[in-house]
Amino acid sequence: MSVGCACPGCSSKSFKLYSPKEPPNGNAFPPFHPGTMLDRDVGPTPMYPPTYLEPGIGRHTPYGNQTDYRIFELNKRLQNWTEECDNLWWDAFTTEFFEDDAMLTITFCLEDGPKRYTIGRTLIPRYFRSIFEGGATELYYVLKHPKESFHNNFVSLDCDQCTMVTQHGKPMFTQVCVEGRLYLEFMFDDMMRIKTWHFSIRQHRELIPRSILAMHAQDPQMLDQLSKNITRCGLSNSTLNYLRLCVILEPMQELMSRHKTYSLSPRDCLKTCLFQKWQRMVAPPAEPARQQPSKRRKRKMSGGSTMSSGGGNTNNSNSKKKSPASTFALSSQVPDVMVVGEPTLMGGEFGDEDERLITRLENTQFDAANGIDDEDSFNNSPALGANSPWNSKPPSSQESKSENPTSQASQ
């Protein structure tokens, strides 16, 4: 189909309108003309922009998203349907476009209220087959302004203006356009198969050619028959009956699979499934892992306090070799001593009572070097008690020699 351009100053003579059945990444594309609206008999057709050259790669980017092309392939495969197609053909069709754990959901509203049907991978082939068994000779989907989103392991396609078009030849040639929202989830791999199919139907229209109305303009009975719908909410009676049957068939898939795998009788399959379901319900919940109590660290006494408590047993001859800073007692008598508290460790395993103290002293009035050189000033320190072992002077070398022979004689 060719249409001339009405834009002023445009040199384009004609261009082709692309059907939703044609590939979106063709070799030629119609130029975009602002203010020009194009319609076909089946409804508005999306205009496909031209491909653009990727900078630095040197090749043309294929038009559109991979999800759009998968819908085109699905429409093309449905066009190959004939009345000779059997269950194997429909199963191969479903295997090509749907995952093994795919779920298909159809929602619509009838006279008695809203309906929602969800079927699994095993029942999906029969759903598409029921559309053709209901009198349809052609089926395809038209997507307008679809939105694609990338996720961790799948790609979602959300189209708020989706039209499912079916053509019926009996009792009269009728084209049924079902409008609604289509949400698909494609697995992000090489096969790009559908994992989730959710079609929410809003409204439908049934179109009849004017030529047929003109032929039966003088027949009131025929006109009354043509005025009646051949579908309910865009679905034939064959499809509606199958969806109602799926309410029973879907829960029985486990029984059928067990019967096919283990060759058990239906009664035994039902007993086994009920017993396993009862076990899952009665099984006690897994106990949560008990949190081990955090080990509390005991505060270590500082070196100075240890020496002060057991100073009577220490050898006085080695006292001068030790640094006064390390053996200095933590006493409140020392002025201007700052003790810094250590914050809790990372992870929050220790509480406030488990915080340790840093045994670092900051005293600007005390110089450790002067204490070593001046023995008298060190011994007269107010931090030392009256009975401190540091006040007693070490024995001279001659006294120590005189004590050694006495000890040897006693042995």
From Swiss-Prot:
Main location group: nucleus
Protein family (similarity comment): Belongs to the LDB family.
Ranges for domain LIM interaction domain (LID): 336-375
Stated name of the protein: LIM domain-binding protein 1
Low complexity bias locations: 302-318
GO molecular function: LIM domain binding; protein homodimerization activity; transcription coregulator activity
A UniProt-annotated Pfam family: LID
Domain notes: The dimerization domain is located in the N-terminus.
